[in-house]
């Protein structure tokens, strides 16, 4: 695939594939990364996509490995969540849907994703690349994720509900907020909201 991509993502966090999240655990992640290193002959930038529901010990271990291993470029934070906490405070027309299985994306994962981004930025002291995902539909959402430590952002749910025009809207608002807050470029914003790094 190397001629066709800028980077690859190893997804070890989809809640819809039974047992996949076990790859985030100590012991499993190390052997996976060893295999990735052997297979990545072209040295493509490689990211690991983690869960917003990840255990703190597993998160610390993954961060430690990412700093140590040259084969991993960074983390994609985060996949969908199995948590339904963000739904309980909302009035949902079909409340039975709260109990459905599968991962939630978009606004329901936003706060969890932001929390993990901030933790990873602190744990790695900003030494790895972070791609922020989850609940980005405005420039303000992107600004927040970047200020918590991510270097890049990805969108999906907002693209579905708002169409391709959402990209230019996000970029315009993000650019406005960066200038308004005294930054000359987006890289100056990375991790600015994170304390004690």
Which ranges hold each PLM region?
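Glycine-rich phosphate-binding active-site loops on the catalytic face of alpha/beta enzymes
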Residues: 12, 73-82, 135-136, 142-169
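Short beta-strand/loop segments at the ligand-binding rim of alpha/beta enzyme cores
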Residues: 39-51, 120-132
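Extended, intrinsically disordered, low-complexity segments
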Residues: 110, 172-197
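Internal alpha/beta core interface subdomains
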Residues: 1-16
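Generic structural signal for well-ordered alpha-helices
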Residues: 2, 26-37, 59-64, 117, ...
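Glycine/Thr-rich beta-alpha phosphate-binding loop at enzyme active sites
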Residues: 12-25, 63, 67-68, 72-126
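Catalytic cores of alpha/beta
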Residues: 54-69, 121-126, 136-153
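C-terminal helical cap(s) of enzyme catalytic domains, especially alpha/beta-barrels
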Residues: 84-102, 146, 159-183
